[in-house]
Amino acid sequence: MAGMKEIRGKIKSVQNTRKITKAMEMVAASKMRRAQERMRAARPYAEKVRAIAAHMSRANPEYRHPFMVANDGVKTAGMILVTTDKGLCGGLNTNVLRASLQKFKELEEQGQKVEATAIGGKGLGFLNRFGAKVISQVVHLGDTPHLDKLIGAVKTQLDLYSEGKLSAVYLAYTRFVNTMKQETVIEQLLPLSSEHFDTNDGTPATSWDYIYEPDAQAVVDELLVRYVEALVYQAVAENMASEQSARMVAMKAASDNAKTVISELQLSYNKSRQAAITKELSEIVGGAAAV
């Protein structure tokens, strides 16, 4: 059995670790609430832009934006991979990276090369180790996603698709469900399908009569770019909310495990102390009997 001094040292070390994980749990809980608020605040904008784009598309069926046209025959696909910059968030990054790797392999089996955009340091490191072609990246977003930081990296993918150099663009991220559950999502961002413009709100699929300045094509072009950017921003906001939730849960589990270890070490310490006292008493009794 280890000595009492050694056990006391272990107890002190685990107690210090538990203080750190407990503090990180509280910080993550605070950041999680703010991240959820940002995530929910971003949804109405994306929904409104989608609704307007749907009405305008029905009002101008003769015009097809490049985002709505499939680039058949192109042997290169795009992938926007959203991960975190930091670790200590459970299996959140591992799950999305594993799913992305599977998607890479599926595309390669179909004869497609992949050009990737990394949002987040963990994804960038993975893509570099994997040997993927990274055409744009953005890292160190902090706790608040800013669209102006994302636009440059995302625009690289959008421009390549508009020029007919990509067959499709996929978006991989972690969707926030609730505090205890997050889902890995890989969805097709481009070309935009009719599903993107389904209202699903019970309203009839009518066309509104708009007055365009300068013209319908220019408005639709700008609107669809804004819509796709909003989808990416929403994915980043969902990923950040998922990150803080996963980190809070992971740090709580670490704190609980530390508490269990401390209890076990305390029990071991008490046994060692009891054995030492018993030994001393035995020696005293033995000495008295000898006299």
From Swiss-Prot:
Keywords from the UniProt entry: ATP synthesis, Cell inner membrane, Cell membrane, CF(1), Hydrogen ion transport, Ion transport, Membrane, Transport
Q: Which GO terms describe its cellular component?
A: plasma membrane; proton-transporting ATP synthase complex
Under the heading PROSITE patterns, the entry gives: ATPASE_GAMMA
tRNA processing: present as a keyword of the record? Answer: no
Disulphides:
none
Q: SUPFAM superfamilies, per this entry?
A: ATP synthase (F1-ATPase), gamma subunit
Alphabetized InterPro entries for the sequence: ATP_synth_F1_ATPase_gsu (IPR035968), ATP_synth_F1_gsu (IPR000131), ATP_synth_F1_gsu_CS (IPR023632)
Membrane topology according to the record:
Peripheral membrane protein
The main location class comes to: membrane
GO MF, one example: proton-transporting ATP synthase activity, rotational mechanism
User: Which GO terms fall under biological process for this protein?
Assistant: proton motive force-driven plasma membrane ATP synthesis
Please give the HAMAP family that the UniProt record associates with this protein: ATP_synth_gamma_bact
- SUBUNIT field: F-type ATPases have 2 components, CF(1) - the catalytic core - and CF(0) - the membrane proton channel. CF(1) has five subunits: alpha(3), beta(3), gamma(1), delta(1), epsilon(1). CF(0) has three main subunits: a, b and c.
Q: What is the protein name stated in its UniProt record?
A: ATP synthase gamma chain
Q: Which organism is it from?
A: Burkholderia pseudomallei (strain 1106a)
| Gene of this entry | atpG
